[in-house]
Structure formats: structure tokens, C-alpha cells
């Protein structure tokens, strides 16, 4: 069978309804969520005004992984994103581990975004307790589930509207903020600033830069994937990096970084300093829109990963079921609803960031290696995007991910170890037989190759 760039490995149960704008909505909806509105204050407290350079450095380090994702998505445009890339190239336990870490990272991130939206609503509820905020978050998650259940078109429509709202507020914050920036605030130096602290900040904000990954989880629903996916990935990373840098400059320039350190609403705080109390609520609306957009995009991607791992028998096979009418993976959406709700009922921002960073860094390092395997096995689809300077770019992608892992704090590494053990349990319960089939297949291929080589040798001797 001849595979074209636009239908390679496709799944006819999904409709290709998204163009470049729709794909961008998914990527930007995730990248411009909790990253700048929620964790930027904590990051500023870690390194001060050097936060601007930290966002630039993270964007530059991430570009290698983005290029590799673009190439993989063109040759393997299937639901599941990074997990599917690893599964179709490497296979076995490494593929499961990739999917596991990306799945858990997305689940926890959804909890963060839901809680962030709940906190914006909680401002208007006198003495709102954590339990009430948790219930609000679960209600928001249920609404997100219903939107995703209805259709992908509904999700991208919501993302498009929310992206417009958050973009107006964020761009206004940047445009107005430049007039309030004070050189003396930017010239401040954090007393603990050093290479390790700088890299620790980069790893901490890394969660803000993986939104492009979510584009590939909906590959089977994007029109002309060979053309639109690479463009959407690179544009998402470029636009988000520039916005992050500009917003960070305003955050640390308008007021001393110590005023927003450890704040989970830094933009609202700075908005109020610039324009008064009324602006606080304007920024709050932007925070709500931004985080709800991120929740929708990440919720969508998480369900797609669960669907893909069910399809490949690493998760229960019921998760691969797709509604014929709505073209959505209902069981996978329900699983995502349950797990995200459980986390949102008791989660916190720091835990989310640490868990997500560990999972993404480990998972993406394996995905970067998948490009090397893709090329060596000759699986690339002719006429599609291919990253330059092979194999330098994939190797740099692996290095830039793994070198950040040791800079995570000890709690992140401990939690990462617990997640790894949990993944082993899930693999033994569901993936072991699947892995045996994979190994048996490799053994059969090796035996066939050996028999072929022996046959050629005998023929040559005759």
C-alpha cells in the first residue's frame, strides 16, 4: 500500500476537521495557560529579573524537541502524540513508559488548570474553603468533559474564543506594562542567582513549553497534517516564547521581583499596581480564560493518549472505543474525567509543576530518540518535513531534556520515582502480554533474517 503524507497511519474513525488555526488553538491554548498566570511569580522568586532570560533559554532548548515532533507527526500522524511516536518506532516498555509519563503529566496539569479557574471564581465567594474550591474545580472539569464529549469541533471553538479573550488581556498587560517598567527593578540581582539556580528555574517553567506536544495528539483530526502540523508546532513555540519573555519583563520590571515571589496570581498583582483595583479583576478574567483554555486542550490530549494506549493494549482495550456518531473516544474521556477530578480535589500548584516537569522531561527524551529510530528503519514518509542536521538535532533534544532532570528539586525526583513504580505495576497488569508479543515479533523477524542470510550464503556457494 502506498502511504501519502496526509494519510499515513490514519484512523478512519476520526474526521479531519482542523486546519492550521484549529491546530494553533490547541497548542497556544495549552501553552498560554498556567505557565505565565500561575507559576511565573514563583519562578521570579527563584532568580529575579533573570526570569526573562530563563524563558528565552527554555524556548531555545525546547526547539530541538519541537523539530523532532514535527518530523514524527508527519510520518506517524496518529492519535496519541509522543506516545504513539515511541510505540511505532521503538515499541515495547520504552513506548509504554513514554505514554505513561505523558499521560500522568497531562492529568496532573489538568488538575492545576481546573484549580486555577476555581480560584478565580473563589474570589467572589466570601471565605471559600479549599473543599468548596475543590467542588468548583470538579464542576469545571465536568463542563470540560461535556464539551469534549460533544465533538472536537466544539472544543476548538471554545479554545478559539478563550484564546481571543486571553490574548487581548495578555497583550494589553504587556503593552501597558512597558510604560511602567522601572530600570532599577530590572537591574536587581537575586542573591542566589547562579548556573544551577538558573537551570532549576528553566526546568521548573518547562511545563509552560510543552503545549505544542498536544497538537500531535489530535493528528488524525488535522487537515493536511504534513503541511499544517509542522507549521502549527513551530508557530506555537515561537509565539508563546515571545509572549512569555515580554510578560516576564513587565512582571519583574513594574515592581521588585520580591513583590510577586511565590504569588500564584502575579499578573493580577502587577495589573493592580499599574492601573488600580479594577485591573485586578480584568487580569483575573484573563487568568480564568487562559487556564480554562489550557484545561480544554490538555483534557483533549490526555483522552487521546488513553485511547491510543488502550488501542495498543497497554491500558484496558475498552479505552479504544470511539463513538460512531460523535467521533470521540468516550471511555477515554470518562477515565480522564475521573482521574483529573480526583487530583483537583486535593492538588496544589507546586506538586503539579514538579510532577509534570519530571514526566515531560523523561517522556520527551524517549520521543527525541524515536526520530533516530524512525530514520534508521526507513519509516519516514517521502515528501514530508524532516529536521535538519540529522542526527545532531535528535541527540540535542535528548540531552536538553535529560540535563534538566537533576535540577528538579528533591520532592520532584522522589515523586518521579513513585510514578515510575506505579507505571511498572500498570505495565505488569496490562502491558506485559503486549510486550511479549512485541518481543516475539522481533525474534521472528531476526529468525527470518538469519534464514534469509543462510539461504543467500548457500546460493552463493553453489
Predicted regions and their residues:
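C-terminal membrane-solvent junction of multi-pass transporters and transport-like membrane proteins
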Residues: 158, 192, 318-327, 364-412, ...
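A generic transmembrane alpha-helix motif of multi-pass inner-membrane proteins
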Residues: 359-360, 389-462
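Hydrophobic transmembrane alpha-helices that form the core helical bundles
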Residues: 42-46, 54, 63-141, 145-149, ...
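Hydrophobic alpha-helical segments of multi-pass membrane transport proteins
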Residues: 169-173, 306, 356-383, 420-439
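TM-loop-TM module centered on a large, flexible mid-protein loop between adjacent transmembrane helices
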Residues: 84-85, 91, 122-127, 202, ...
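Membrane-interface "cap" regions at the ends of multi-pass membrane proteins
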Residues: 1-40, 45-50, 62-67, 78-79, ...
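Membrane-interface loop-to-helix entry segments
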Residues: 132-181, 192-194, 233-237, 356-366, ...
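Helix-loop-helix junctions that connect adjacent transmembrane segments
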Residues: 3-15, 51-52, 56, 127-132, ...
Amino acid at each position: 500500500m502506498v502511504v501519502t503524507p496526509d494519510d499515513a497511519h490514519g484512523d478512519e474513525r476520526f474526521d479531519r476537521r482542523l486546519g492550521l488555526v484549529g491546530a494553533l488553538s490547541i497548542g497556544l491554548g495549552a501553552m498560554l495557560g498556567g505557565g505565565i498566570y500561575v507559576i511565573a511569580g514563583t519562578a521570579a522568586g527563584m532568580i529575579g529579573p533573570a526570569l526573562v532570560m530563563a524563558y528565552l533559554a527554555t524556548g531555545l532548548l525546547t526547539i530541538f524537541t519541537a523539530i523532532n515532533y514535527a518530523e514524527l507527526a508527519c510520518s506517524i500522524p496518529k492519535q496519541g502524540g509522543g506516545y504513539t511516536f515511541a510505540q511505532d518506532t521503538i515499541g515495547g516498555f520504552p513506548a509504554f513508559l513514554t505514554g505513561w509519563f505523558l499521560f500522568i503529566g497531562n492529568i496532573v496539569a489538568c488538575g492545576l488548570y481546573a484549580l486555577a479557574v476555581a480560584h478565580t471564581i473563589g474570589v467572589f465567594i466570601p471565605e471559600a474553603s479549599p473543599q468548596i474550591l475543590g467542588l468548583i474545580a470538579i464542576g469545571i472539569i465536568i463542563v470540560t468533559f461535556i464539551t469534549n464529549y460533544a465533538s472536537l469541533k466544539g472544543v476548538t471553538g471554545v479554545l478559539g474564543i478563550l484564546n481571543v479573550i486571553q490574548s487581548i488581556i495578555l497583550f494589553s498587560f504587556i503593552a501597558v506594562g512597558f510604560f511602567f517598567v522601572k530600570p532599577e527593578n530590572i537591574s536587581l540581582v537575586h542573591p542566589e542567582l547562579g548556573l544551577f539556580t538558573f537551570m532549576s528555574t528553566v526546568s521548573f517553567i518547562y511545563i509552560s513549553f510543552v503545549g505544542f506536544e498536544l497538537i500531535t495528539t489530535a493528528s488524525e483530526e488535522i487537515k493536511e497534517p504534513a503541511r499544517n502540523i509542522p507549521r502549527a508546532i513551530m508557530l506555537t513555540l515561537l509565539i508563546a516564547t515571545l509572549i512569555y519573555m515580554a510578560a516576564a519583563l513587565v512582571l519583574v520590571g513594574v515592581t521588585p521581583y520580591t513583590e510577586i515571589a511565590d504569588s500564584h496570581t502575579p499578573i493580577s498583582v502587577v495589573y493592580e499596581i499599574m492601573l488600580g483595583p479594577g485591573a485586578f479583576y480584568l487580569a483575573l478574567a484573563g487568568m480564568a480564560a487562559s487556564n480554562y483554555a489550557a484545561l480544554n486542550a490538555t483534557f483533549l490530549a490526555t483522552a487521546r493518549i488513553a485511547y491510543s494506549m488502550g488501542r495498543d493494549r497497554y491500558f484496558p482495550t475498552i479505552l479504544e472505543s470511539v463513538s460512531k456518531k460523535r467521533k470521540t473516544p468516550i471511555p477515554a474521556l470518562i477515565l480522564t474525567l475521573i482521574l483529573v477530578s480526583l487530583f483537583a480535589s486535593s492538588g496544589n500548584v507546586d506538586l503539579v509543576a514538579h510532577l509534570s516537569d519530571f514526566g515531560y522531561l523523561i517522556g520527551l527524551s524517549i520521543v527525541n530518540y524515536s526520530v533516530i529510530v524512525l530514520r534508521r528503519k526507513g519509516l519516514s514518509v517521502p515528501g514530508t518535513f524532516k529536521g535538519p542536521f540529522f542526527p545532531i538535532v535528535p541527540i540535542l533534544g535528548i540531552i536538553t531534556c535529560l540535563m534538566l532532570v537533576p535540577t528538579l528539586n528533591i520532592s520532584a525526583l522522589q515523586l518521579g520515582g513513585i510514578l515510575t513504580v506505579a507505571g511498572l505495576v500498570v505495565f505488569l497488569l496490562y502491558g506485559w502480554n503486549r510486550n511479549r508479543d512485541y518481543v516475539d515479533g522481533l525474534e521472528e523477524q531476526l529468525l527470518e533474517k538469519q534464514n534469509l542470510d543462510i539461504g543467500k550464503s548457500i546460493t552463493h556457494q553453489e
